[in-house]
Amino acid sequence: MSDWTAGYVADIGYTFGYYTELNPLRVKLAFLDAGLVAPDVGTACELGFGQGVSANLHAAASVVSWHGTDFNPSQAGFAQELAAASGSGAHLHDDTFADFCSRPDLPDFDYIGLHGIWSWISDANRAVIVDFIRRKLKVGGVLYISYNTLPGWSTFAPLRHLLTQHAGTMGANGTGIVQRIEGALGFADRLLATQPLYSRANPSVPERLNTLKGQNRNYLAHEYFNADWHPMYFADMARWLAPAKVGYACSANLLDHVDAINLNAEQQALLKDIPDAQLRQSVRDYMVNQQFRKDYWVKGGRQLSALEQAEALRLLRVVLTTPRADVPLKVTAALGEASMSEAVYGPVLDALADHKPRTLAQLEQMTSGKGVTFAQLNQAVLILAGAGHVQLAQDEQVAGKARKSSDRLNAHLINKARGSADVGYLASPVTGGGFTVDRFAQLFLLARSQGAKQPAEWAQFAWNVLAAQGQRIIKEGKPLDAAEDNLAELRAQAQTFADKRLPILKALMVA
């Protein structure tokens, strides 16, 4: 392995994922729910941006100036391609952390984000990042950091260690990481078949291994097979970040803000008896067996008064991004599946059903006559946002300014969808971030952009693209061989797209 990789998997690219938690706009809802002042973000940085999908969607869909690095030049090259296509001005580099963090041309940042990368890097790189946060995060600025944590990883970490040891020692010379992963997974199967005491003491391990076997190999390579891989207790994370002068603010997982769906009454009572915030978080991790944390930290957190908090919450704009009829009145959290009250959620969803952004003050006016209190409205928005049905919306003026760059990026992405399904997201200047749009939907949008008006025309366009490349639709695990079967499936999907998805994409300024 070449020295520049520093033990990090580099012979296979990371997935083309989008992570909404990296959207600085989300900070507002989380911080206001926690009673904290949320910064206005003008400059942002992502360290270890992978393929750069999140960084580019956020840069193109907002007026925030984005900077970032990923030391894999192939990934950085793709990220730079997207930045050039959008004209967002995002500054995306292929520097090492040490080189990037010492660049003299970087501004100070309102927001710095790291998704997952903390768990996969060396202590030396962690020290570089902590020093960077100390120097470059503004007072009042927010750090988003997600990482593998304990105790949730304590059961499977030993097998992960064995997988990487096997890949490093038993993999044939000259074979790629995918072949080494397959060999390691096969060996783990053989091991568990011998019924070792380890798996008998940890009965969830075989099921977890089966889950791994079904996952994308690019994902597994980066998540599990780096030389450095360190799940970390929350208290250890707090010690690492202390020199950066940041303190824990709140969870970036919005559902974590609602104790009633995560903790039983006894657990809630125990946590209330713990005065120390860090110990409280540590104990909570044991209660929910936390495996992956998504946290916001702040440099100089400030509490809002109850009046300031209520006023700021009422100014938030939100938009429904799921068809009203498709929103289930159930949500899954640490305690399992919880039901949502029709009396509360029904009026809130009805008020948002046209997919137009509305402030919480407007929603309060629209639902108060139906017996919904502001506290209930606030929690409903929080849970709906955490479940992925509602997103925060930018001011109309900001959305208007971002429209040109988001349109350019989307045009580039839907054109690329002709040849690949790699990037399943497009930019929304309404939400300031990405929105899931699969390959076929992107091809339908491409057909519309070329003048096709009807769903049947979109389906024919998509089929022409697929057929020219010898591609077929996979339905229920099997390829559709006949052209008429492929076209029939595409027509059905195009009609559903026209009825359900297109109105939302128009409301989000994606279409």
Enumerate the predicted regions with their spans.
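A short glycine-rich, Lys/Arg-flanked "PGG" loop and its adjoining helix->strand segment in the class I
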Residues: 127-139
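A short acidic, Gly/Pro-enriched loop at the edge of an enzyme's catalytic core
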Residues: 102-112
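Conserved beta-strand signature within the Rossmann-like core of class I S-adenosyl-L-methionine
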Residues: 140-148
